[in-house]
C-alpha cells in the first residue's frame, strides 16, 4: 500500500511504502527551508540534487549531494535548506 504525504504547503511530497517489513519513503523537496521532526531514527539518501542540513548535534550546516546519505536520531528534529529541486529516499530504522 502506498501512502502519499504533502508538507509545507505542498513544497515537500513523499510516497511511503513497506519493503521487507521496513518503512521507506521517497520524495521531492522544492527549494526552501524546512524543519522536520522524527519519531524513529532515519537514514536519508539524496537521490538527485542536494540537501544542506543541521541536526541538533551539528555545530555547522552540512551539505549532502546525489548519492550521499546522513542519519538522524529518533525523537529529534533537523533543519534543511534546499536550493534546487531534490529527490530523496528515507529509510526508517
From Swiss-Prot:
Q: Which UniProt key words apply to this protein?
A: Glycosyltransferase, Transferase
Point out the signal peptide segment: none
List the EC numbers from the record.
Answer: 2.4.2.1, 2.4.2.2
**What catalytic reaction does the record list?**
a purine D-ribonucleoside + phosphate = a purine nucleobase + alpha-D-ribose 1-phosphate; adenosine + phosphate = alpha-D-ribose 1-phosphate + adenine; cytidine + phosphate = cytosine + alpha-D-ribose 1-phosphate; guanosine + phosphate = alpha-D-ribose 1-phosphate + guanine
Molecular function (GO) terms for this protein are: guanosine phosphorylase activity; purine-nucleoside phosphorylase activity; thymidine phosphorylase activity; uridine phosphorylase activity
- Judging by the UniProt lineage, the source's domain of life is Bacteria
Q: Name one GO cellular component term.
A: cytosol
Q: Which InterPro entries match?
A: Ppnp, RmlC-like_jellyroll, RmlC_Cupin_sf
Q: Kindly give the Gene3D superfamilies that the UniProt entry links to this protein.
A: Jelly Rolls
Q: Which family does it belong to?
A: Belongs to the nucleoside phosphorylase PpnP family.
Question: What role is this protein assigned?
Answer: Catalyzes the phosphorolysis of diverse nucleosides, yielding D-ribose 1-phosphate and the respective free bases. Can use uridine, adenosine, guanosine, cytidine, thymidine, inosine and xanthosine as substrates. Also catalyzes the reverse reactions.
- Report the PANTHER family cross-referenced here: PYRIMIDINE/PURINE NUCLEOSIDE PHOSPHORYLASE, PYRIMIDINE_PURINE NUCLEOSIDE PHOSPHORYLASE
Task: Quote the protein name from its UniProt record.
Answer: Pyrimidine/purine nucleoside phosphorylase
Source organism: Aliivibrio salmonicida (strain LFI1238) (Vibrio salmonicida (strain LFI1238))
